[in-house]
């Protein structure tokens, strides 16, 4: 298990960047944290760590955003989903089979879709600026 305390959004992004630079294709990063905790900032850093220059935004309404480049990042926001069945309905298994890194916000809503090999990232808001980031699971922890 790895733990960090960040004092700004850019520091949160830097942790995501550091993690993603080492992730093999096909990794699933399950993100947990309340509204405004910094999940999207973390994914923005992940994209940068994967060499992607795309503008990363939360896919709350589209549910899925795909970022293509030297490596592929698929960004899910499960806030509006009520269970894993809905994730499978939008093609979860197809996304997994592409070998892309999948970052899943609001993972608590779809935990039954995971196979136990995901990397779990919990972001807790300590203050307006500070976040505690806990990373566990997967081959890197």
Placement of each model-derived feature along the sequence:
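P-loop (Walker A) phosphate-binding loop of NTP-binding proteins
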Residues: 34
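Phosphate-binding P-loop
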Residues: 20-25
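Short beta-strand-centered segment that lines the nucleotide-binding/catalytic pocket of NTP-utilizing
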Residues: 52-67
